[in-house]
Amino acid sequence: MPDAIDDLFRRFGKAFNKADVEEIAACVTDDFEWRLNAGAAPAGTVLKGKEGLRAHFSDKSKAHREARYSEARIHRAGDKIFGTFRVTGVDHAGKPFDRYGIDLYEIKDGKIALKDSYLKTID
């Protein structure tokens, strides 16, 4: 039977796929942290708060066109949550991409507080 966490991730996933920044922001805490899959070591680029999220999506639309997430699954291991997914699209150079990824999540007060992202690196 679905519960509040399932509903949260269903809303979050739909909003993410549509790049609906305000709906995504409604699913995360005010102090939300997103550790991107690229950037400076060790954590990659770290976005902080809803404003960091909004700024990323305004830039991301220029970097990745037609990004589409599929095969998304949420998995629970005790109090830990992780999501697996496939993302396809076109990068900033116009080259198509197709990758699998995983996100590690922390939940606080019924919202997503941390999204730590990892993608397969394909040559």
Language-model segment annotations:
Residues 1-31:
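Short, low-complexity N-terminal intrinsically disordered segments enriched in polar/charged residues
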